[in-house]
Design a protein with these regions (language model features):
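Histidine-centered phosphotransfer motif of kinases
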Residues: 1
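Short hydrophobic/aromatic patch on the recognition helix
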Residues: 5, 9, 54-55, 59
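…primarily DNA-binding HTH/wHTH and HhH modules…
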Residues: 57-72
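Terminal helix-turn-helix DNA-binding modules in bacterial transcription factors
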Residues: 11-53, 72
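Residues in the helix-turn-helix
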Residues: 4, 39, 53-54, 66
Length: 72
């Protein structure tokens, strides 16, 4: 069942499935931000965020930097 899978995933990876996916998305965004000149909303869309503002919040929470700070 779902709770069993969630527990096993967290036991294996140390984070919830949702957190794992979020981290992978932010990792992908870092590569895109460094290698392209795409606008922030385009990067957000490319990695699966529908809201670029929420993407920026998640990015800052995970990296400790704003998107702008990271890109400089």
């Amino acid at each position: 069942n779902d709770s069993y899978l969630s527990r096993e995933f967290k036991k294996t990876y140390g984070v919830s499935f949702i957190e794992y996916i979020s981290r992978k998305r932010i990792e992908a965004s870092k590569k895109i931000l460094k290698e392209t000149d795409l606008k922030v909303y385009e990067v957000a869309e490319k990695i699966g965020f529908k809201d670029s503002h929420y993407f920026c919040i998640c990015f800052k929470k995970q990296t400790g930097q704003t998107v702008k700070e990271y890109r400089v």
